[in-house]
Amino acid sequence: MTAPSKPVLVADIGGTNARFALADVDASVPLLDDTSREFAVVDFTSLGEAARYYLDQIGVQATQGVFAVAGRVDGDEARITNHPWVISRSRTASMLGFSTLHLINDFAAQAMAISLLRPQDVVQVGGASWRPAPIDQPRNYGVIGPGTGLGVGGLIIRHGRCFPLETEGGHVSFPPGTPEEIRILEILSEQFGRVSNERLICGPGLVNIHRALSEIAGVDPGPLQPKDITARAAAGDPRSSRTIDLFCAIFGAIAGDMVLMQGAWDGVFLTGGLVPKVLDSLQHSGFRQRFEHKGRFSAIMSRVPSLAVMHPHAGLLGAAAYAVDAQRQPPGEQR
């Protein structure tokens, strides 16, 4: 490995694992994939300790960093639910001897990754074909991703700069679109009170949909995990298959609503841990029909691309993109 002259340490910090890599902001492909490493969070007492261990392992000293964290960034600190680390930007920068350290939300990183995605990093799920655009062309993109929760964000590109939209769109109220979905909403309302999109479109959401369908059928499904539902659907179980179909259709409806709310006419990127697992279902389900079914805007919506992100390290890619964009920032400008 040949280290760049001014390496930037990038990280993607989740609840269980921490991923690190180096980025070269002057390279045409900034993320140096061969430098990526993954460590268990529980093996280190702090983010700084994990980052120092990584740098020592690869024998490189960086002075700048961009760390994406799966939680809310509030000033100097980032908080991740049920996480052993208290993440402080200033303390971590001091421990590592960094002159600059950015903490960003993990979904801001997913949005920033769009600016570096290549055609081979995505799979078309419908709409017009997509090609990466030069950074000086204005673009509005949406990004939505089911995992343990539902992340929703966007990316605005203007005048050669990238501006991620950090939202809590996963917590918007769920809008049922069919009588069956109305009944599911009624059942989930009895359990949760208010029902957000995240109650259905995420890993636990698969279980919620399946349990609601089981209640409608008058049966008890017993203990379930999301992986049980996808496995049963693959084996031909009708209720599990219907769960996946509903998941994809509702996902499409919500993604389409996001386009209308954000003006994300240039494309929607589907990310998160569940997307690769249900990709075939997304391509052969009601996802696009519900995505496009927006009344007077249906014709326009039919042209909006929806793309599944298949890059194995999209969070690291987004952190690298943030580092690249920071180099374009005029002196004294605040994000």
Curated annotation (Swiss-Prot):
Keywords: ATP-binding, Cytoplasm, Glycolysis, Kinase, Nucleotide-binding, Transferase. Its EC number is 2.7.1.2. It comes from the Bacteria. It is found in: Cytoplasm. ATP binds at residues 11-16. CDD domains: ASKHA_NBD_GLK. Pfam families: Glucokinase. It catalyses: D-glucose + ATP = D-glucose 6-phosphate + ADP + H(+). GO terms for cellular component: cytosol. One of its GO terms (biological process) is glycolytic process. GO terms for molecular function: ATP binding; D-glucose binding; glucokinase activity. HAMAP family: Glucokinase. Belongs to the bacterial glucokinase family. This is Glucokinase. It comes from Xanthomonas oryzae pv. oryzae (strain KACC10331 / KXO85). The lineage of its organism: Bacteria, Pseudomonadati, Pseudomonadota, Gammaproteobacteria, Lysobacterales.
